[in-house]
Amino acid sequence: MIKLGIVMDPIAHINIKKDTSFAMLLEAQRRGYELHYMEMADLYLINGEARACTRTLSVEQNYDKWYEFGSEQEIKLADLDVILMRKDPPFDTEFIYATYILERAEEEGTLIVNKPQSLRDCNEKLYTAWFADLTPETLVTRNKAQLKAFWEKHGDIIMKPLDGMGGASIFRVKEGDPNIGVIAETLTELGNRYCMAQNYLPAIKDGDKRVLVVDGEPVPYCLARIPQGGETRGNLAAGGRGEPRPLSESDWEIARRVGPTLKAKGLIFVGLDIIGDRLTEINVTSPTCVREIEAEYPISITGMLMDAIEARLAK
């Protein structure tokens, strides 16, 4: 029997209708895995050995009672076959410390999804720089004058922090906007933090597409997140509506270009964000949108993931 651990935000507070981690747990349970539940505070390191206080878990598709804890035990993380790291951002120093603990278990043979070192290496906004020919024009800087020059060149830009999620603190700055200076100062904290600027992509009106990649293989359907009227952000957390649809030709091209690199880095479950034919983000920490896609199309994305995990464990 496969022993699967999951590190996640409190399960008591999730929305099971759209929670991807919950979908993963349902599929793992369907396959007869033993489920071990952990939150960040349950992980610890003693003399170099990664350990955790885990609770065995059963889940069900029931809006009144979707989980039940069984026994509680202190275990070596290496006693688990696989651990899903599904803690949502912020990607802060605490998150980084947790990846080091998980990496100690990985060195003893436990499969970590996604690979701890690659979680540290691949910032969701910045990692697109390794595929610059696929992205919008992009500037990463602390310098207000550079941001202003980029805005003057393009006339219509998006500015965002490097560590936001769910569309937080994303600004669209159009030609002639008198607020460019204060937005630059706010995002860079007066030149003390890096931020990102990209040329505005009108294709956002048709949605910001979440394309999932499982162990290097693109999922054939995506979720287009369409902004509300007057909004430039499609993120569901920012009020966008989700519309599942098949991948376009350019979606396939981008996912097939990026997929092999992700697989080689041990990034087994990744969400690409694509606007039109441009790659805008590579989400590696806790990608979502599985349930919305699975509700619309006859596909089991979590099944693809568990197949990939089983194949890696069999090696």
UniProtKB/Swiss-Prot annotation:
Ranges where the ATP-grasp domain occurs: 125-310
Catalytic reaction list: gamma-L-glutamyl-L-cysteine + glycine + ATP = glutathione + ADP + phosphate + H(+)
EC number(s) on file: 6.3.2.3
GO MF terms held by the record: ATP binding; glutathione synthase activity; metal ion binding
Entry-linked Pfam families: GSH-S_ATP (PF02955), GSH-S_N (PF02951)
InterPro entries in alphabetical order: ATP-grasp, ATP_grasp_subdomain_1, Glut_synth_pro, GSHS_ATP-bd, GSHS_N, PreATP-grasp_dom_sf
PANTHER family attached to this UniProt entry: GLUTATHIONE SYNTHETASE, RIBOSOMAL PROTEIN S6 MODIFICATION PROTEIN
Name of the protein described by the UniProt record: Glutathione synthetase
Organism for this UniProt entry: Salmonella typhi
Gene that specifies this protein: gshB
